[in-house]
Each structure stands twice: as structure tokens, then as C-alpha cells.
A protein has these predicted regions:
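Phosphate/pyrophosphate-binding loops at sites that engage ATP/ADP/AMP, CoA/4′-phosphopantetheine
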Residues: 43-58, 201-218
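Phosphate-binding/catalytic loop of phosphoryl-transfer enzymes
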Residues: 74, 82-162, 191-206, 288
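Short glycine-aspartate micro-motif
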Residues: 2-6, 59-61, 123-127, 221-223
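Conserved phosphate-binding/catalytic loops in two-lobed NTP-binding clefts
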Residues: 81-93, 237-253
């Protein structure tokens, strides 16, 4: 089976791909100092929570924003003798219209591929992670840029670690904006403030994308993803068309299917992709069998 593996700065997210289904989707804390052995133990342990194991993995589709762990994952795949595809700007099946494509995180590009394939274009993906990213896809299916803000948990951590008397608090939406104690005041500033930031930036981006693409703002697909996309405060955001916490994993599955020529959905093939040729995606590491 294919293992979709997303290595972020905060979390490692993975899932086994079976047809159109992401199975055994799990998250764990990223440990940048991991060895190939430690990464394999982590992945195997997560898969075993759902009755699977590394023995079931025949290929790995990887998006990583941690360069050291990209190398660790490559070494792990080579030792196990499984194919590895590393997503990056050089093997995306869509035009990338930004000044320096090499600076765009692999997860952001994978999200763009997934949203275009699964939800249509033009589109905006909002990914709530260590950073919150806003990524835009044009009407003709090109990645055209976006925005990056500190993630909500990063802001909360900064408040607690950089001040003498502010405590660490739970990310919970307060009943009102005016807090009557330290905890409720912090919850108001962090949760309600972050929601306002997200809404304001999303509205600006949607308006600008609609203008450049000559479409009505209401015709732009807005999809939330990331672990916090299912948080109560995020689920209440207006103007959102879908919440898809596994969007990145689905994008990795799509990229693998395009690279291998396998059907993405029943009756579909890589040749049906409305972007660059599937052959532009290559397996960058394939251990000898």
C-alpha cells in the first residue's frame, strides 16, 4: 500500500492510501533529530494503532518542510526497499507562477494540487499548522502564491514563554470578547483575535483573486485543512466551502498516481490530468529490489 507522509515543523501526519480512501490517518510530534530507525519505529507504531504496519507499505509519497527529515525518510525507504517520491516544485503537475518556486513549501504545493483536483478552481486553501498558510490556485489551475502568518498555537506559545505572568491556556473559544480574568482575556485575544485575522486576510485574498481571475468572489472554492481545521472556532468561519483535514495526504496520493500512471479514481488515469504531463513527476529514490 502507499504511505502518504507529510513531515511538518510541528507534526508528522500520515495515512495509508487504499483506492480513494485515506486509511489509518494519524499525527505525531515532529522530532527533527530522528534517525531512520526512529522514524520507522514512529511510523510503524502509528500504523499499528489501526491494525497495519510498515510491512504493508510498498511506496511512500512524501512532502517535507524539514530538510534533515527528508534525508532520514529517504534513508529509511532505501533500507526497506520501497519506492519514495518526494514532492517539490520540480515535479508538480501545475504551473507555479511565483518569483521563487523553490521557496514554496512542498505541503503548500501539494495542497494546491489536491484542491484543484478535488474541489475545482479558482480556489484558496487555508492550512492551520505551525504557520497558517493561505494558498491560491488560478482558474486555469496554476499555483499563484498566497500568504503566511504565525499559527495560532505559535502565538499562544509566544505569549506564555515571552511573558512573566501569563499562563499556558487551553485553546477554547470564550463566550464573549471582553474577558473578566487573565485566562478568558487571553482566550479572547488568541482565539477570537485569530479568527478575525483569518477572516480579514481571507476576505482580502478572495477579493484580489476574484479580480485577477475575473470571477465572482462567491465562485472561489475555499477549503480549510490542517489539524486545527476541525476546531470549533475554525468550523464557524463563514464563507468556507469545505473542511478537509486530510487534504495534504490526498494530494500526495494524487501525485503518486500521476507519477505511476495508476487510476486516481475509478475510470480515471494520469493522462486525464489537466496540467503538466504526468511524466514530469518522477520517483527520485528507488531502492534496488
Amino acid at each position: 500500500m502507499l504511505l502518504a507522509l507529510d513531515i511538518g515543523n510541528t507534526n508528522v501526519t500520515l495515512g495509508l492510501v487504499h483506492g480513494e480512501t485515506i486509511m489509518a490517518a494519524r499525527r505525531a510530534t515532529t522530532k527533527a533529530a530522528s534517525t531512520p530507525d526512529e522514524l520507522e519505529v514512529l511510523i510503524d507504531g502509528l500504523l499499528r494503532l489501526d491494525g497495519a504496519s510498515m510491512a504493508d507499505v510498498t511506496g511512500i509519497s512524501l512532502a517535507s518542510v524539514v530538510p534533515t527529515l527528508t534525508g532520514v525518510a529517504t534513508a529509511m525507504a532505501e533500507r526497506r526497499g520501497v519506492q519514495l517520491m518526494v514532492a517539490g516544485p520540480g515535479n508538480m503537475p501545475m504551473p507555479i507562477r511565483v518569483q521563487r518556486s523553490v521557496e514554496v513549501g512542498a505541503d503548500r504545493l501539494v495542497n494546491a494540487v489536491a484542491v484543484a483536483r478535488l474541489y475545482g478552481t479558482p480556489a484558496i486553501v487555508v492550512d492551520f499548522g505551525t504557520a497558517t498558510t493561505f494558498d491560491c490556485v488560478s482558474r486555469d489551475g496554476a499555483y499563484v502564491g498566497g500568504a503566511i502568518t504565525p499559527g495560532i498555537e505559535l502565538g499562544l506559545e509566544a505569549l506564555a514563554s515571552r511573558t512573566a505572568r501569563l499562563p499556558r491556556i487551553e485553546l477554547q473559544e470564550p463566550p464573549k470578547a471582553i474577558g473578566t480574568d487573565t485566562v478568558s482575556a487571553m482566550q479572547s485575544g488568541v482565539v477570537l483575535g485569530y479568527r478575525a485575522l483569518t477572516l480579514g486576510l481571507l476576505e482580502s485574498i478572495r477579493t484580489e483573486l476574484a479580480r485577477t481571475e475575473k470571477v465572482d468572489p462567491g465562485n472561489i472554492q475555499v477549503v480549510l485543512t490542517g489539524g486545527l481545521s476541525v476546531a470549533p472556532w475554525a468550523r464557524k468561519l463563514p464563507g468556507v466551502d469545505a473542511i478537509d483535514p486530510e487534504l495534504t495526504l490526498k494530494g500526495l496520493a494524487i501525485l503518486w498516481a500521476l507519477a505511476s500512471g495508476e487510476p486516481i479514481v475509478p475510470g480515471d488515469t494520469a493522462a486525464g490530468w489537466t496540467g503538466s504531463a504526468a511524466g514530469s513527476i518522477h520517483i527520485i529514490s528507488e531502492a534496488a529490489k
